[in-house]
């Protein structure tokens, strides 16, 4: 049975019946009801429109967030696939046979503490030399031998080290192809005229067979020994020796030298060794069993001579050639006498470096008897593994400078240890890895570490940037320390020289003083003996001289040398003190520079040092690289979220405070009005139902509107409450609520601030309704006590955001640790389960349920 209990309404509205049903509902006393002045569509819109919009916005934000998460997951998977692909390619490449590989080797340098046996060390003054700094070392206890069956250290050096010095000028035209034809050189015995004839079968002249080659644009024809060239496929095309090697290219050549009669450009000159023969007293005689350094087209046999008339003499020959145009370049012929030359491989041809005051010439020599050699100057070639650039018609070398090679001989007998020191840079060059001795390629764990190489790529980029700065800082620091150290050494040497001079003067003064004392003693003895002044004049004259004491000290003449000594001692003393003071200052500055770390460089070194020390198995451990990959992957996938959260916290701190206070104010306001409204409504219902308020609460969710249908409203009470909280501005004041039972009263009076208990409530309500609020006004209201939490605490919000971000990072770490522990636990459980099953299987096998073995019966 349905009975109508109350008709209520508002002025201008539709009277809405409030009905009661006998159906029971849950008792909720804090729920507020408003008169039904709308139809079902209006009620649905009023109760659900805001919630629907909020849900739609939340869904959109979740969709965007999910999409971003998916995007970063895709990026992470892409990096993982890229690492796997790169690792696979490197793994495949590792399996291929490699004759050469690119290694990091420094160019140039000198030997330090080498114990070099009978070797000439040519360092420092070479053009293009760069110093070494402890890059690699080689040790052996084998001595030098002339036996072909013994591998010496210099031969190992030849096989391994010298091949790394391969550089070329970018503008060099040395290694081009030449069109050459074989010719004979015939001379008459009575004259120095030599004819050039085109023949098929060539004969030797001056110890060599000859080629006539046309250079670029057929503008120049060169007459060269056949030993300098290499034929290509039995054709008329020839190339110089050494051009089939692998070359590293440099951008410019540092110096020009005179090559024969031609000014050439030397790109990079590496160090080389030449050996002095054993048991030879004359240190100017150099043997020819050094390593192959490819100075020009030098063969395995080589030597160095000083260019003078006693060693080599120029043979002036006239070369006659018919029918040629342009430039015809002929070699220079020498006759040389070399003593104590022993061929390393019993070959007749040797290479000789002949250096003079302003030039260096490279000779090819052929032994025609025991000591006499016929030599020719090389026309072109490779000097010290560097291309030579010959002048062309439209290209000239300007500002020529010539280099002198200063060599010193080390007469030690054992070749035990050498080390390359003082390096300023590392250059990637091809290095052979097939030889049995010498510099050997040490493989790093590259099978599985092919994947490792891809994994650590990102870390290598950051490490390279950090370490590059560290290296530059350290290099600058070392250079400064070296400069100060050199100043200290120079000052110390100068001070020692001055002290030595002072000591010499002081010693002379002491001797002279001793002589004077001896004279005084003698005079005293004469006075004591004779007590006569005249007798003293018969003795040695007591004179104050300044000359050093010697055997004839009694015959010195009086002079002012002593005063000069004193003056010099004072001057030297001042110079010594000044020099030593400067040395002390330089030494102190050197120590300060060396011990003062650069903050950024020190941070970089400490950072990567801690990373390297923390990761287990530093070296070849695969665990290190796996952990590093996980850290990099975590950083790549988490850093965008962290940065985005930080941006949200910093950019939205101001508006967040306004929204928070707005929400708190409306919540408090709504709570007061809800309590008062509910009390008024209870009083009204008590008058209608005869005091049976409980009966109303049991049926309050069963109210129907004028047509008896309120199912839509009854099913969504929580949505109605949320809608009321969201639309705080639609709330009506206490006075308006009271007007429900008094139709015709004005509703907007309270909204204008004329009613209410709080005089600031109306203005604050309008201020909060403005979008975003006003931080300054919020602070004013907070000081007046009308706000619970001030919105001007931006540092607090920022700090809280940072705490959240740090917590998020810690959360990632803890979750990762939890995953690792879970995986380890599963692995241990699997191992224990396998062990259990094995033991159970073995136990069942040894103790079957039914025995098939009959035990023997004893009767």
Swiss-Prot record:
Q: Where is this region: Fusion peptide?
A: 446-466
Record's comment on post-translational modification: Specific enzymatic cleavages in vivo yield mature proteins. Envelope glycoproteins are synthesized as an inactive precursor that is N-glycosylated and processed likely by host cell furin or by a furin-like protease in the Golgi to yield the mature SU and TM proteins. The cleavage site between SU and TM requires the minimal sequence [KR]-X-[KR]-R.
Q: Where is this site: Cleavage?
A: 444-445, 684-685
Give the InterPro entries listed for this entry. GP41-like, Gp90_EIAV
Which residue ranges does the record annotate as region Immunosuppression?
498-513
According to its UniProt entry, one GO biological process term is: symbiont entry into host cell
Annotated transmembrane regions: 615-635
Any one Gene Ontology molecular-function term assigned to this protein's record: structural molecule activity
Gene Ontology CC terms: host cell plasma membrane; membrane; viral envelope; virion membrane
The reply to whether Flavoprotein figures as a keyword in the UniProt entry is: no
Q: Which residues form a coiled coil?
A: 576-624, 663-699
Keyword annotations for this protein, in alphabetical order, are: Cleavage on pair of basic residues, Coiled coil, Disulfide bond, Glycoprotein, Host cell membrane, Host membrane, Host-virus interaction, Membrane, Transmembrane, Transmembrane helix, Viral attachment to host cell, Viral envelope protein, Virion, Virus entry into host cell
Q: Which positions carry the propeptide annotation?
A: 1-6
- Residues carrying covalently attached carbohydrate according to the record: 40, 112, 141, 148, 186, 214, 233, 244, 313, 340, 368, 399, 406, 411, 483, 490, 550, 557
- Keyword Repeat in the entry? The reply is no
According to the UniProt topology, which residue ranges lie Extracellular?
Answer: 7-614
Cytoplasmic side residue ranges read 636-859
Q: Which domain of life is it from?
A: Viruses
- Its quaternary structure? The mature envelope protein (Env) consists of a trimer of SU-TM heterodimers attached by noncovalent interactions or by a labile interchain disulfide bond.
The free-text function statement in the UniProt record for this protein reads: The surface protein (SU) attaches the virus to the host cell by binding to its receptor. This interaction triggers the refolding of the transmembrane protein (TM) and is thought to activate its fusogenic potential by unmasking its fusion peptide. Fusion occurs at the host cell plasma membrane. The transmembrane protein (TM) acts as a class I viral fusion protein. Under the current model, the protein has at least 3 conformational states: pre-fusion native state, pre-hairpin intermediate state, and post-fusion hairpin state. During viral and target cell membrane fusion, the coiled coil regions (heptad repeats) assume a trimer-of-hairpins structure, positioning the fusion peptide in close proximity to the C-terminal region of the ectodomain. The formation of this structure appears to drive apposition and subsequent fusion of viral and target cell membranes.
Know the name of this protein?
Envelope glycoprotein
Task: Please report the organism this UniProt entry assigns to the protein.
Answer: Equine infectious anemia virus (strain WSU5) (EIAV)
Task: Tell me the classification of the organism that encodes this protein.
Answer: Viruses, Riboviria, Pararnavirae, Artverviricota, Revtraviricetes
């Amino acid at each position: 049975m349905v009975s109508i209990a109350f008709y209520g309404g508002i002025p201008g509205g539709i009277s809405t019946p409030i009905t009661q049903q006998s159906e029971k509902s849950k008792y909720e006393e804090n729920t507020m009801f408003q008169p039904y002045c709308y139809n079902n569509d209006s009620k649905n819109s009023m109760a659900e429109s805001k919630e629907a919009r909020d849900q739609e916005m939340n869904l959109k934000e979740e969709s965007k967030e999910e999409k971003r998460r998916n995007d970063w997951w895709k990026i992470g998977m892409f990096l993982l696939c890229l690492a796997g692909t790169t690792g696979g390619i490197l793994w495949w490449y590792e399996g291929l046979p490699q004759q050469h590989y690119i290694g990091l080797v420094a160019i140039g340098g000198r030997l330090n503490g080498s114990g070099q046996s009978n070797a000439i060390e040519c360092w420092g003054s070479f053009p293009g030399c760069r110093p070494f700094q402890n890059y690699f070392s080689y040790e052996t206890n084998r001595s030098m031998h002339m036996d072909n069956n013994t591998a010496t250290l210099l031969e190992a050096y030849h096989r391994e080290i010298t091949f790394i010095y391969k550089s070329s000028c970018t503008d060099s035209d040395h290694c081009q192809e030449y069109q050459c034809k074989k010719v004979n050189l015939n001379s008459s015995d009575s004259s120095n005229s030599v004819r050039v004839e085109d023949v098929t079968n060539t004969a030797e002249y001056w110890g060599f067979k000859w080629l006539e080659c046309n250079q670029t644009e057929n503008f120049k024809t060169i007459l060269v020994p056949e030993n300098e060239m290499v034929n290509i496929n039995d054709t008329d095309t020839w190339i110089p020796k050494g051009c089939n090697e692998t070359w590293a290219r440099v951008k410019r050549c540092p110096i020009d030298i005179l090559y024969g009669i031609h000014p050439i450009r030397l790109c990079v000159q590496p160090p080389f060794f030449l050996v002095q023969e054993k048991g030879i007293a004359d240190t100017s005689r150099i043997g020819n069993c050094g390593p192959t350094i490819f100075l020009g087209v030098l063969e395995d046999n080589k030597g160095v001579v000083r260019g003078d008339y006693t060693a080599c003499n120029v043979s002036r020959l006239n070369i006659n050639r018919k029918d040629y145009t342009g430039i015809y370049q002929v070699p220079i012929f020498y006759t040389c006498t070399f003593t104590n030359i022993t061929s390393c491989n019993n070959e007749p041809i040797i290479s000789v470096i002949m250096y003079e005051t302003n030039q260096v010439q490279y000779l090819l020599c052929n032994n025609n008897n025991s000591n006499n050699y016929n030599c020719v100057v090389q026309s072109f070639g490779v000097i010290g593994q560097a291309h030579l650039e010959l002048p062309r018609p439209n290209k000239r070398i300007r500002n020529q400078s010539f280099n002198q090679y200063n060599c010193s001989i080390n007469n030690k007998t054992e070749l035990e240890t050498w080390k390359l020191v003082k390096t300023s840079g590392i250059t990637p060059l091809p290095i052979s890895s097939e030889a049995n001795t010498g510099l050997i390629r040490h493989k790093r764990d590259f099978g599985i570490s092919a994947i490792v190489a891809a994994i650590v790529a990102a870390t290598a980029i950051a490490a390279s940037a950090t370490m590059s700065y560290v290296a530059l800082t350290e290099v600058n620091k070392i250079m400064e320390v070296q400069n100060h150290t050199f100043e200290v050494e120079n000052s110390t040497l100068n001070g020692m020289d001055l002290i030595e001079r002072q000591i010499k003067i002081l010693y002379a003064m002491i001797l002279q003083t001793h002589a004077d004392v001896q004279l005084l003693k003698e005079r005293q003895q004469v006075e004591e003996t004779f007590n006569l002044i005249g007798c003293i004049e018969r003795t040695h004259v007591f004179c104050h001289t300044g000359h050093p004491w010697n055997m004839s000290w009694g015959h010195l003449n009086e002079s002012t040398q002593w005063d000069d000594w004193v003056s010099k001692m004072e001057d030297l003393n001042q110079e010594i003190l000044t020099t030593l003071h400067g040395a002390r200052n330089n030494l102190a500055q050197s120590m300060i520079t060396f011990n003062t770390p650069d903050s950024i460089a020190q941070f970089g070194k400490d950072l990567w040092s801690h990373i390297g020390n923390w990761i287990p198995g530093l070296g070849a451990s695969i665990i290190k690289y796996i952990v590093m990959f996980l850290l990099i992957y975590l950083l790549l996938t988490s850093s965008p979220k962290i940065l985005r959260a930080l941006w949200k916290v910093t950019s939205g701190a101001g508006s967040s405070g306004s929204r928070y206070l707005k929400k708190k104010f409306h919540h408090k306001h709504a709570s007061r009005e809800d309590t008062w409204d509910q009390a008024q409504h209870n009083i009204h219902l008590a008058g209608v139902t005869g005091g049976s308020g409980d009966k109303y609460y049991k049926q309050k969710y069963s109210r129907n509107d004028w047509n008896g249908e309120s199912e839509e409203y009854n099913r969504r009470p929580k949505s109605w409450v949320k809608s009321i909280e969201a639309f705080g501005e639609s709330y009506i004041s206490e006075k308006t609520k009271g007007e429900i039972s008094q139709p015709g009263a004005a509703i907007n009076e309270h909204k204008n601030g004329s009613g209410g208990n709080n005089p600031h409530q109306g203005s604050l309500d309008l201020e909060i309704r403005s979008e975003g609020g006003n931080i300054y006004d919020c602070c004013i209201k907070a000081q007046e006590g009308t706000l619970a939490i001030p919105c001007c605490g931006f540092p607090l919000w920022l700090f809280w955001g940072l705490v959240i971000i740090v917590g998020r990072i810690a959360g990632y770490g803890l979750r990762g640790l939890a995953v690792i522990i879970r995986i380890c636990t599963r692995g241990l459980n699997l191992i224990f389960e396998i062990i259990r099953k094995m033991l159970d299987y073995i136990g069942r096998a040894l103790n079957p349920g039914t025995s098939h073995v009959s035990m023997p019966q004893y009767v």
